[in-house]
């Protein structure tokens, strides 16, 4: 698709800065950037025959959304075993390119893919930037740093080396070596799995990194102009990540006042990623999730959201992230649900939630002042929505309402269908049975009674 000079007229502009909507405001996009807004935009376009007009009357014009937590390489696994043992590097690379196109169709023009299989996210980012693959702007991490105890996979993680999205590091020398290796191969961020599940402990994840280890990660990465993001699903991990110098904290589950104070003092940003938990809590029964977990997920959202409301009031930068890439968050489907959850659970206004998904998201893209707002000089990433998301934030989830997606000043084809993906049997765990076939399960009471008389 070629770069176009575009004048969008008649729409109501939400510019992403947090300012109120501006009715009937023109936006001029020229040479891949936002050049002017309002009457000056119309005047400048009038003398340029190369400008094509888009009539957005009755629609909302806003920056393309930024999803700050995606996993485009994962292939939508139903569980860790599929993710770890049913993926190949070449196929996952091709699938991630397919996924990138779906992301754009959902009105998301930028993503931060924090950890990935192999080093695919870095390669996908470069393929998109070089025009080989159609997709959103990307910032990429490599494989997450993990102790043997990190994450949710437990014993599936090998004791040494890499497993799927993770690389095990046992001491500070290994951490430094792996950070330097990832930076050598082009990552924008280093991700650390600060918490994990321990088989002998019941309940939520626990912190599995020492403070000194976390500080060493940050010092090493920051010396090489690379930011650090942490998976933190308890209060202690959030507190120590902030104190250690982490730039962005995912989840911040069960955050308490002490952890919040550390976040405020450090200037770290938060990306709660409620969407995955919300989908499990609200729809898990429809996809066979364990019933006893559904209310646990909802409780985690509610407890964490109460503290996020305090964080928002304290001026903490909050980003939106969907954790797209799992079976419960398939690519292209749920990117904008995080805005709905910020409104419903954290108490934000729709306008505040949009700011989290646009201007604030530029932080994850390492492009503050470049992306995320409709202001003169910003990159021309724009979406046009049929309706007003300030009246109902949920319309941003309805792809049929997205009438235009403009990425890097280029209009994205929204009409040509993307071929439907079929899932290969080799990608999935195939169960012979969901539970043991006992005789009492197989036979009726009458069968058992007759057999007892034989």
Feature map (PLM): residue ranges:
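Active-site microenvironment of metallo-dependent hydrolases
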Residues: 1-25, 30-31, 35, 40, ...
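Active-site metal-binding motif and surrounding structural segment of the metallo-beta-lactamase
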Residues: 42-62
């Amino acid at each position: 698709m070629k770069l176009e000079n575009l004048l969008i007229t008649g729409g109501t502009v939400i510019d992403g800065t947090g300012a109120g909507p501006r009715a009937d405001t023109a936006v001029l996009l020229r040479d891949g950037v936002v050049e002017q807004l309002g009457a000056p935009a119309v005047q400048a376009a009038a003398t340029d025959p190369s400008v094509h007009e888009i009539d957005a009357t009755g629609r909302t014009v806003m920056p393309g959304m930024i999803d700050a937590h995606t996993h485009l390489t994962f292939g939508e696994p139903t569980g860790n075993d599929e993710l770890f043992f049913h993926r190949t590097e070449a196929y996952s690379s091709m699938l991630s390119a397919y996924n990138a196109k779906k992301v754009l169709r959902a009105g998301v023009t930028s993503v931060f893919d924090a950890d990935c299989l192999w080093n695919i996210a870095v390669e996908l980012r470069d393929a998109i930037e070089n025009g080989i693959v159609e997709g959103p702007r990307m910032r990429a991490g490599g494989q997450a740093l993990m102790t043997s105890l990190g994450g949710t996979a437990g014993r599936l993680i090998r004791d040494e080396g890499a497993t799927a999205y993770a690389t095990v590091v046992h001491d500070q020398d290994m951490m430094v070596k792996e950070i330097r290796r990832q930076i050598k191969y082009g990552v924008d961020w280093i991700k650390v799995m600060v918490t994990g599940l321990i088989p002998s402990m019941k309940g939520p994840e626990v912190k599995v990194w020492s403070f000194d280890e976390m500080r060493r990660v940050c010092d090493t990465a920051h010396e090489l102009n690379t930011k650090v993001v942490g998976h933190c699903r308890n209060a202690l991990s959030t507190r120590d990540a902030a104190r250690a110098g982490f730039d962005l904290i995912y989840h911040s589950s069960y955050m308490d006042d002490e952890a919040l104070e550390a976040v405020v003092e450090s200037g770290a940003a938060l990306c709660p990623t409620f969407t995955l938990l919300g989908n499990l809590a609200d729809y898990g029964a429809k996809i066979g999730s364990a019933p006893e977990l559904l209310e646990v997920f909802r409780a985690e959202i509610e407890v964490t959201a109460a503290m996020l409301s305090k964080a928002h009031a304290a001026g903490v930068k909050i980003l939106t992230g969907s954790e797209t890439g799992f079976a419960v968050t398939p690519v292209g489907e749920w990117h904008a649900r995080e805005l709905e959850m910020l409104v419903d659970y954290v108490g934000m206004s729709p306008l505040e939630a949009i700011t989290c998904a646009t201007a604030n998201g530029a932080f994850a893209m390492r492009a503050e002042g470049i992306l995320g707002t409709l202001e003169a000089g910003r990159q021309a990433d724009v979406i046009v929505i049929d309706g007003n998301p300030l009246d109902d934030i949920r319309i941003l989830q309805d792809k049929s309402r997205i009438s235009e997606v403009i990425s890097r000043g280029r209009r994205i084809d929204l009409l040509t269908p993307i071929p439907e993906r079929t899932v290969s049997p080799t990608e999935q765990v195939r169960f012979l049975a969901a539970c043991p076939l006992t005789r009492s399960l197989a036979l009726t009471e009458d069968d058992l009674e007759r057999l007892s008389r034989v």
